[in-house]
Regions:
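Positively charged n-region of N-terminal signal peptides that target proteins for export
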Residues: 1-5
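Ubiquitin-like/PB1-type beta-grasp interaction modules and other compact soluble beta-rich domains
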Residues: 22-158, 281
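Preference for long, amphipathic alpha-helical scaffolds in soluble/luminal domains
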Residues: 128-132, 146-431
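C-terminal motif of bacterial Sec signal peptides marking the signal peptidase cleavage site
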Residues: 17-20
Length: 431
C-alpha cells in the first residue's frame, strides 16, 4: 500500500515526526513520502551535565531497551542512542531517519514515535536537546487509522498487525528450528516465513538467514522413506505439503524424487479422488508421470469441490502445483468454482473458518469482502472477536470450529493478507 501524501496541518506533521531528523522529515514506508518543514534549531538552553534515560518499546509494547547515559559523554540524543542501541537509520547531510532500534519493527503504517518526558516530542532525534533527568521513550504506534482521522485502518486491522508481529517474533522463532516434520503445522510456518522473506518484513522481525536455514534443515531431515506413513494422517496431500515447502526454499529434491518414484511404481489405486491432483501434479513436475499406471489415471476419478470446505485448502495447494495436466488427465479447479463453494459455506460456522480464509487469499480476494453470517460480520472481525485471546495474543483452536487445524494456518493467511494490503499487490498464498 502506498502511503498517502497528506496535505495536513503542522499539528499532524508534528505528530508523525517519528524518530527523524529535525528538518525535511520523511516517512520510511511506501513509494510516496510525507514531508514536513520542522525547524532543526532550538533556542532552549539546557545543562551539559547529569544523565538522561532512553527506553525503546517494540510493536508488542515490550520494553526491548533501557539505558541511562551521561550527558557529558553523550551530549546529544542521537549520540547516546547510536552508542547504546542497535540502530538502523537512513539520511543525508548529518540527519538521521531511524528505521529500527534493537530490531524493533517500523512496519507499514506504524511509526517510531519519540516521547520526551512522556510528552510527544515536537521534533525528531536530531532536533532534541537533552537535559539532566530527561526520559526519552521510543514507541511503535499506528498512525494510519480511521479513528485518528488520517487513515483507513480500523481497530481490527491494527489488531491484525499486532498479532502477526507477535507471531513472527515468538512462535516462528521457537518452533521452526525445533521441528522435525514438515507434514503439519511447520508447513504453514514455511508459508509465513516465505511471505516475510519475499516482502522484506524479515529484516525487522528476525534474522531471515538463520531461520530459513533452520527451516531448510528441518525439511531436509524429514523422513521420506515411507511417505504415506510419515504421520498418523499422511496422505498425498501431506506429501504435497513437504514437496511444496521444499520447492519454496530451494531444497535438494534428489532423495525425494527417488523415494517418490518408488512410491509411484507401487501405486495401484488412489485412496480417494481427493488425493488425485496432488499425486498427478508432483509427478508431472518431477517428470515421473510415466510411472503412473493408466488404470490409476482413470478419468472418472476426478477431484471435485464436493468434499466440503475441509478440502478447500488442500485443493488450492493442488491447483498451485498443477502445471501441465490437461483435461484428459485432470479436471482443473476454477476460481469461480472455489468462489462459489466459499459463498455456499457462508453461515456454516460448524466448519473451521480457517478454510474460508485460505482460498480467499489464494484467489487474490479481500477476506473482509465476504460475509460469515447473516449480520454481515466480516471474517477478520469474526476471528478476533470469537477466536482470539487478546491477552495472550493467540488464536484458540478449539473455537475455530470442526477440524484439527493449527493456528499456524490462520497466521499464514493473515500474513499473506497483510502483505497484500500493505504493498497493494496481489499475494497468492499457494504459489
Amino acid at each position: 500500500m502506498k502511503k498517502r501524501l497528506f496535505a495536513a496541518s503542522m499539528a499532524f506533521g508534528l505528530a508523525i515526526v517519528l524518530a527523524s531528523c529535525g528538518g525535511d522529515n520523511q516517512t520510511t514506508s511506501g513509494d510516496v513520502k510525507t514531508t514536513t518543514d520542522l525547524d532543526k534549531t532550538t533556542t532552549e538552553t539546557k545543562t551539559n551535565s547529569g544523565s538522561y534515560t532512553i527506553e525503546v518499546y517494540d510493536l508488542d509494547g515490550e520494553l526491548v531497551g533501557n539505558e541511562t547515559l551521561s550527558i557529558e559523554e553523550y551530549p546529544s540524543l542521537w549520540e547516546g542512542l547510536n552508542a547504546k542501541f542497535d540502530v538502523e537509520a537512513t539520511g543525508s547531510d548529518g540527519s538521521h531517519w531511524l528505521t529500527s532500534i534493537n530490531q524493533t519493527v517500523v512496519d507499514k503504517s506504524w511509526s517510531l514515535m519519540i516521547y520526551e518526558n512522556d510528552t510527544l516530542a515536537s521534533t525528531g532525534v536530531d532536533g532534541i536537546v537533552v537535559d539532566n533527568g530527561d526520559k526519552f521513550t521510543f514507541k511503535n504506534e499506528c498512525w494510519n487509522t480511521v479513528e485518528s482521522g488520517w487513515g483507513s485502518m480500523d481497530s481490527y486491522e491494527v489488531l491484525l498487525d499486532q498479532a502477526v508481529y507477535h507471531y513472527a517474533k515468538t512462535k516462528m522463532k521457537t518452533s521452526i528450528a525445533s521441528s522435525t516434520s514438515c507434514f503439519d503445522s511447520t508447513f504453514w510456518q514455511s508459508i509465513s516465513l516465505y511471505n516475510m522473506m519475499k516482502n522484506k518484513y524479515d529484516s525487522n522481525l528476525f534474522n531471515v538467514n538463520s531461520y530459513s536455514d533452520a527451516y531448510k534443515e528441518s525439511i531436509t531431515n524429514a523422513n521420506l522413506d515411507d511417505l504415506r506413513n510419515a504421520t498418523a494422517w499422511a496422505t498425498d496431500a501431506n506429501i504435497a505439503k513437504w514437496y511444496y515447502a521444499a520447492r519454496l526454499f530451494d531444497t535438494d529434491l534428489t532423495k525425494f524424487k527417488e523415494v517418490y518414484g518408488t512410491y509411484l511404481d507401487s501405486l495401484t489405486t488412489y485412496g480417494s479422488e481427493y488425493e488425485m491432483p496432488f499425486t498427478l501434479s508432483i509427478a508431472k513436475e518431477l517428470e515421473l508421470d510415466n510411472k503412473i499406471k493408466d488404470d490409476v489415471k482413470n478419468p472418472t476419478s476426478r477431484a471435485s469441490l464436493q468434499y466440503g470446505t475441509d478440502a478447500l485448502a488442500w485443493q488450492i495447494t493442488g491447483m498451485a502445483l498443477y502445471t501441465t495436466l490437461d483435461d484428459s488427465e485432470f479436471s482443473p479447479f476454477t476460481l469461480d468454482a472455489i468462489n462459489a463453494a466459499v459463498n455456499d459455506f457462508g453461515a456454516d460456522l460448524s466448519t473451521s473458518v480457517a478454510n474460508v480464509l485460505f482460498p480467499l487469499v489464494a484467489m487474490n480476494k479481500n477476506p473482509r469482502d465476504f460475509a460469515l453470517d447473516e449480520s454481515n460480520t466480516d471474517l477478520i472481525k469474526y476471528l478476533f472477536d470469537n477466536c482470539y485471546d487478546k491477552e495472550n495474543q493467540e488464536f484458540l483452536t478449539e473455537k475455530l470450529g470442526a477440524g484439527d487445524y493449527s493456528s499456524n494456518q490462520i497466521y499464514a493467511s493473515l500474513m499473506a493478507y497483510k502483505v497484500q494490503r500493505d504493498t497493494g499487490t496481489g499475494v497468492i498464498l499457494f504459489a
